[in-house]
């Protein structure tokens, strides 16, 4: 099984990016959660508008599915400017970036998703553009080549990344504002589910919103995906009404348990306990035991399990915690 196949995957699936636009908030006041980020951004935006300046360049980082793209669009909307969107892997040549920069209007937003995947050549073009609003372009080839400078209108670059540590220092230092998005509390996710249901004209109870929220692994993208699948279940079997009972039945059918775990999560934790006596177990042995690639364990399965206190990473290997034993209804063996 690969990450994209999981109902609780944090990656956007198929046309989800397009579907989610209908339920995305457009104003900071409608943005649920991340209170410190929202408070700071409201001040920064208001100050920039009072000075009639472009907003400082903004770096947004955090785990996938937490609303980095949504926040970028809100910033542009609040500033009353256009937003042009691209991603690091798409910008293969310096000319691709130059074309986008020269088409910006004053104070516009250029949003680059996965900015950590920019090539060094693209970064070199970005440095003077971000710092001096200038674009250095090479004209001609060989000995006849020469560099010319083009003035750019003041603009805001918003970069989004799940790996802030992978950004080069020169690029990271050019962002005047840096915001980290954290996993959401269940209460905030419950509000997000209720808001999304309202946007989709769904009949849903408060308790059903809560049942979906607490299985969403702190991630709005997962919450909205589960809501759509629960809606399908309710449309077919419960006349379109999403109650606590129908939500629980749908989530059981989807194999998402109360902790937000699916089959793969349980398989990994169970292997650590049953096959390796709770650990420590090396990553390669664990990967062989559950039939998955070690990269899948490191990048997909482990982060949430560690963050929730179900798995511990030690110098000697992975270990199950007391919480894991309680989850399976087992008693931890002591030597």
Swiss-Prot record:
Homohexamer. Forms an RuvA(8)-RuvB(12)-Holliday junction (HJ) complex. HJ DNA is sandwiched between 2 RuvA tetramers; dsDNA enters through RuvA and exits via RuvB. An RuvB hexamer assembles on each DNA strand where it exits the tetramer. Each RuvB hexamer is contacted by two RuvA subunits (via domain III) on 2 adjacent RuvB subunits; this complex drives branch migration. In the full resolvosome a probable DNA-RuvA(4)-RuvB(12)-RuvC(2) complex forms which resolves the HJ. GO terms for biological process: DNA recombination; DNA repair. This is Holliday junction branch migration complex subunit RuvB. SMART domains: AAA. Disulfide bonds: none annotated. It comes from Pasteurella multocida (strain Pm70). Residues 4-184 are annotated as: Large ATPase domain (RuvB-L). The lineage of its organism: Bacteria, Pseudomonadati, Pseudomonadota, Gammaproteobacteria, Pasteurellales. The RuvA-RuvB-RuvC complex processes Holliday junction (HJ) DNA during genetic recombination and DNA repair, while the RuvA-RuvB complex plays an important role in the rescue of blocked DNA replication forks via replication fork reversal (RFR). RuvA specifically binds to HJ cruciform DNA, conferring on it an open structure. The RuvB hexamer acts as an ATP-dependent pump, pulling dsDNA into and through the RuvAB complex. RuvB forms 2 homohexamers on either side of HJ DNA bound by 1 or 2 RuvA tetramers; 4 subunits per hexamer contact DNA at a time. Has 3 domains, the large (RuvB-L) and small ATPase (RuvB-S) domains and the C-terminal head (RuvB-H) domain. The head domain binds DNA, while the ATPase domains jointly bind ATP, ADP or are empty depending on the state of the subunit in the translocation cycle. During a single DNA translocation step the structure of each domain remains the same, but their relative positions change. GO terms for molecular function: ATP binding; ATP hydrolysis activity; four-way junction DNA binding; four-way junction helicase activity. The gene is ruvB.
